[in-house]
C-alpha cells in the first residue's frame, strides 16, 4: 500500500515553487537595515476607530476618497488592498486563465510578479530589458501572443531608473484589446512627474500599482492601491477578499492621506532625495565600488569588486544590504536603501575599510 504524504497532496506547481525571498525572510541580525527600501524611522499615529467588534468596509470610503484626491483620479478608479502585492495577484486572478494564459515581465525587476503567477498556475514569460534597462519592445511584441497581463515597474526595482514614457505609449498601443498593462509605481513619490495616472482616460487597459510602504513610511501597515478604469476595478472587486483592510489599517491610511499627511510625506521625500545624493557622491569615491547607477528612488544600485565578500563583510558588521547578484545583468550588484545620515555614514565607513 503506497503512502501519500501531505506534500504529495499539494498542487504540483506549489510543490515546485520557490517562494519570494523577502528582506525579512532572508533575515540577518543587523542594526542598520538597508535591504527592504523602507523609510528609516517610524511615523506615529493614534487610532481613532475603536469599533473592532464590527467588520470593516470592504473599500473604506475615506481611504478611497483621500487616495483618489491625492492621485488625481476618480474614487471609482481606486481599489485598496493588502499592499500592492495583493494588487499584483488580483490582476492575474481576474484576467488570466490558469494553464492557458500568460503574464509577461522584464527582468531585472521585482520578484513578486512571477511568484504570484506561478502560485496561481499561470505561465510566466520574460523579455529581459536592454543594456540601458529600457524595454525591449520588439522582444515584447514577439512574445505577446497569449499574454493577458504585462508588468512594468517604473521606477524599476532594483535598478532605480524610470521607463521611457514613449516606450510605455508604444507598449500600450501594442497591447490594446489584447492585454492589461500594469505600471508598478511603488516608488513614484520620489519622481511624481513620471506617473501614468493621467493616462487612464486614454488607455482603458492600463492599471497602476501604488503603495503606502515607501514614501508614506508605512511598510508595516500593508496597504496598497490599484488605479484603473472602473471596468477593471469592478472585475478586481469580484476576486478580492470581502474585508481586505482591517479597521486600524484603514484608520491609519486615512490619516496618512489627509492634507497634513501628504505634506509630511513630501517632506520625507525631499529629505531622502538629499540623503540619496550625498550617499551617491560618497560611493563614487570608494575604491571597492566599480559603478553607481542613477536612481529616481529611495535606494541605490551599485556594482562592487568582490560583491559577495563586501556583502558578507557588511552583514557581519550588522549592516544588511540586498544582494542582486542573481538577477539578470546585475552580477556584482548590491542594492542599498537610503536611510538616515548616521546609517549612510556607517555604510560609507565600512566600505572604505574594505581591502580591494
From Swiss-Prot:
Its cofactor is pyridoxal 5'-phosphate. Keywords: Amino-acid biosynthesis, Aminotransferase, Histidine biosynthesis, Pyridoxal phosphate, Transferase. GO terms for molecular function: histidinol-phosphate transaminase activity; pyridoxal phosphate binding. Its EC number is 2.6.1.9. It catalyses: L-histidinol phosphate + 2-oxoglutarate = 3-(imidazol-4-yl)-2-oxopropyl phosphate + L-glutamate. The keyword Amino-acid biosynthesis applies. Coiled coil: none annotated. PANTHER family: HISTIDINOL-PHOSPHATE AMINOTRANSFERASE (PTHR42885:SF2), HISTIDINOL-PHOSPHATE AMINOTRANSFERASE-RELATED (PTHR42885). Belongs to the class-II pyridoxal-phosphate-dependent aminotransferase family. Histidinol-phosphate aminotransferase subfamily. This is Histidinol-phosphate aminotransferase. The gene is hisC.
Amino acid at each position: 500500500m503506497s503512502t501519500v504524504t501531505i506534500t504529495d497532496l499539494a498542487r504540483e506547481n506549489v510543490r515546485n515553487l520557490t517562494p519570494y525571498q523577502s528582506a525579512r525572510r532572508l533575515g540577518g541580525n543587523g542594526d542598520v537595515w538597508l535591504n527592504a527600501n523602507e523609510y528609516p524611522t517610524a511615523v506615529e499615529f493614534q487610532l481613532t476607530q475603536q469599533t473592532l467588534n464590527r467588520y470593516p468596509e470592504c473599500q473604506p470610503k475615506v481611504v478611497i476618497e483621500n487616495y483618489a484626491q491625492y492621485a488625481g483620479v476618480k474614487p471609482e478608479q481606486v481599489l485598496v488592498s493588502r499592499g500592492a502585492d495583493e494588487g499584483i495577484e488580483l490582476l492575474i486572478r481576474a484576467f488570466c486563465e490558469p494553464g492557458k494564459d500568460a503574464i509577461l515581465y522584464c527582468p531585472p525587476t521585482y520578484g513578486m510578479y512571477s511568484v504570484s503567477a506561478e502560485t496561481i498556475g499561470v505561465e510566466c514569460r520574460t523579455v529581459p530589458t536592454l543594456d540601458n534597462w529600457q524595454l525591449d519592445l520588439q522582444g515584447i511584441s514577439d512574445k505577446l501572443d497569449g499574454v493577458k497581463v504585462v508588468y512594468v515597474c517604473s521606477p524599476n526595482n532594483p535598478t532605480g531608473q524610470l521607463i521611457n514614457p514613449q516606450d510605455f505609449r508604444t507598449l500600450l498601443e501594442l497591447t490594446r484589446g489584447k492585454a492589461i498593462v500594469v505600471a508598478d509605481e511603488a516608488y513614484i513619490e520620489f519622481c511624481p512627474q513620471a506617473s501614468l495616472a493621467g493616462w487612464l482616460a486614454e488607455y482603458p487597459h492600463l492599471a497602476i500599482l501604488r503603495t503606502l510602504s515607501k514614501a508614506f513610511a508605512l511598510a508595516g501597515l500593508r496597504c496598497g492601491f490599484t488605479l484603473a478604469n472602473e471596468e477593471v476595478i469592478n472585475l478586481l472587486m469580484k476576486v478580492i477578499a470581502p474585508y481586505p483592510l482591517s479597521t486600524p489599517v484603514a484608520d491609519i491610511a486615512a490619516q496618512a492621506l489627509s492634507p497634513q499627511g501628504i505634506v509630511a510625506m513630501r517632506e520625507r521625500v525631499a529629505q531622502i532625495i538629499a540623503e540619496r545624493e550625498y550617499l551617491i557622491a560618497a560611493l563614487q569615491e570608494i575604491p571597492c565600488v566599480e559603478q553607481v547607477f542613477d536612481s529616481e528612488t529611495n535606494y541605490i544600485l551599485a556594482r562592487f569588486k568582490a560583491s559577495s565578500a563586501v556583502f558578507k563583510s557588511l552583514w557581519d558588521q550588522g549592516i544588511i544590504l540586498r544582494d542582486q547578484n542573481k538577477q539578470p545583468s546585475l552580477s556584482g550588484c548590491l542594492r542599498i536603501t537610503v536611510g538616515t545620515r548616521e546609517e549612510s555614514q556607517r555604510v560609507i565607513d565600512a566600505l572604505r575599510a574594505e581591502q580591494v
